[in-house]
Amino acid sequence: MNIIQQYEADEIARLSAAREVPEFGPGDTVRVSVRVVEGERKRIQAYEGVVIARSNKGLNSNFTVRKISNGEGVERVFPLYAPTIAEIKVVRRGAVRRAKLYYLRGRRGKSARIAERARETVSAEA
């Protein structure tokens, strides 16, 4: 492992210890709490939508969240380990067969719905 890979692994471990990053993927509905600074005021703003893409690139990992606001589709790309993200919460799990859900951009209403994934049952080992 070279120096850069070692540094990125250490940074990911440090940032993961400070804030829990849940497992989520495309199709999942997430609520991202973002720290917003307006002048001297600081507040936390929630952004809730469907994850349409996720790019796993170590420390540079990011994910794209799409929501419909006032009838318009709004997409926002969040770096996974950004210090401006206070919390990521998975609201519901979606069942999809694609890694990138860019086809949702051209859909409206019921055709843009994503079926909910069946809950994973944990069987007790006897």
From Swiss-Prot:
Protein role: This protein is located at the 30S-50S ribosomal subunit interface and may play a role in the structure and function of the aminoacyl-tRNA binding site.
GO BP terms, alphabetized: translation
InterPro entries, per database record: Ribosomal_bL19, Ribosomal_bL19_CS, Ribosomal_bL19_sf, Translation_prot_SH3-like_sf
PROSITE patterns per record: RIBOSOMAL_L19
Swiss-Prot/TrEMBL keywords: Ribonucleoprotein, Ribosomal protein
Annotated protein name in UniProt: Large ribosomal subunit protein bL19
Family to which this protein belongs: Belongs to the bacterial ribosomal protein bL19 family.
Isomerase keyword on record: no
SUPFAM superfamilies in UniProt: Translation proteins SH3-like domain
Organism: Gluconacetobacter diazotrophicus (strain ATCC 49037 / DSM 5601 / CCUG 37298 / CIP 103539 / LMG 7603 / PAl5)
GO terms of molecular function: structural constituent of ribosome
One Gene Ontology CC term in the entry: cytosolic large ribosomal subunit
